[in-house]
Amino acid sequence: MNEARIFGITGPPGAGKSTLTNALTKCWRAKGLRVGIIAVDPTSPFTGGAILGDRVRMGDLTLDTGVFIRSMGTRGQLGGLSPATAGAVHALDACGYDLILLETVGVGQSEVAVMEIADLVLVLNVPGLGDDVQAIKAGILEIGDLFAVNKADRPGADRTANELRAMLELGEDEKRPLPVLLVSASQGTGVTELCEELERQYLLLDGNGELA
């Protein structure tokens, strides 16, 4: 089936993934597209419960009939997603949604399952989370199709973006340059540009036959 475009949004905890998901959804809704959102939160290893708080940051979307939001706990599964994520994606696809956004828990070396489901993966970063060596250790550079530095109004945002660009240039096997954009999801700055770049990168991947 897979008529919907499936975009993964990942990055470290505190990067503003839910706020950005909310902002991007508004951008696509303004174009008349129906958007399904699957937001994954970590499950406690002690209680087995999960605080499904992603929808709190998307409260202004809850009355929009063109948006479906489903929060899930990881239930102990590694990979940054829930065991039920793939099934939920197929269900939303079957329901005719134009876009499906997968928001993962904080990503690390073992949390890259989103790249197996999504057509395209956006890796989000923010200033002040550590140096470039730590970013490489976290494994986030290997899974992204494009990158964004959120909270661009903070000091160090330009430096973080430039460091990411420098690290990405070290990749010798890349078939295409990987863009790094600056955005402030809470203020709306750069969101439209990111929305358009996501669509452009999807078309590039599709044209190159790189989509599953």
Each language-model region and where it sits:
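Short acidic active-site motifs
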Residues: 109-110, 136, 190
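Active-site-proximal loop->helix
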Residues: 48-54, 135-139, 162, 169
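Short, intrinsically disordered, charge-balanced linker/junction segments flanking boundaries
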Residues: 210-212
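Canonical P-loop GTPase G-domain recognition
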Residues: 143-207
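Flexible active-site lid/hinge loop adjacent to a nucleotide/diphosphate
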Residues: 114, 127-155
